[in-house]
């Protein structure tokens, strides 16, 4: 292998080409590669951050759902207590009304009973007087007297 001027010229041209590439072509390529690596790293970091944010959002949503269910249960329990209270109040009012109506009915019955007794006394007195008149008008005969008394008893 002979070293001649062509080989030296090619070597010098290759060295100049390598130096040119290292000076002007390689830095933009490295910058492009570094930017790409940085974008990929940022994208992965954003994906990790988004995944963590998603987990936090899901945890928060789950917590809010639990709180909403607890609040709903409290509202339902409070409504049930109020319902029971209203039912008890209605029962108490109904019992009081029933007692009042019964007392009023008993009072009316007692008043009617007293009125009937008084009326009966008046009728008995009238019948007794009428019987006494009849006895006095007739002769005091035992048979007639017992007949009148039987009629009076039948009328009473």
From Swiss-Prot:
Topological relation to the membrane, as annotated: Single-pass membrane protein
NCBIfam families membership: ATP_synt_b, PRK05759.1-2, PRK05759.1-4
Summary of subunit composition and partner proteins: F-type ATPases have 2 components, F(1) - the catalytic core - and F(0) - the membrane proton channel. F(1) has five subunits: alpha(3), beta(3), gamma(1), delta(1), epsilon(1). F(0) has three main subunits: a(1), b(2) and c(10-14). The alpha and beta chains form an alternating ring which encloses part of the gamma chain. F(1) is attached to F(0) by a central stalk formed by the gamma and epsilon chains, while a peripheral stalk is formed by the delta and b chains.
Pfam name, any one: ATP-synt_B
Cellular localization per UniProt: Cell inner membrane
Gene3D superfamilies associated with the record: 6.10.250.1580
CDD domains: ATP-synt_Fo_b
Cysteine disulfide links: none
Source organism of the structure: Shewanella amazonensis (strain ATCC BAA-1098 / SB2B)
Family: Belongs to the ATPase B chain family.
Protein name per Swiss-Prot or TrEMBL: ATP synthase subunit b
InterPro entries: ATP_synth_B-like_membr_sf, ATP_synth_b/b'su_bac/chlpt, ATP_synth_F0_bsu_bac, ATP_synthase_B_chain
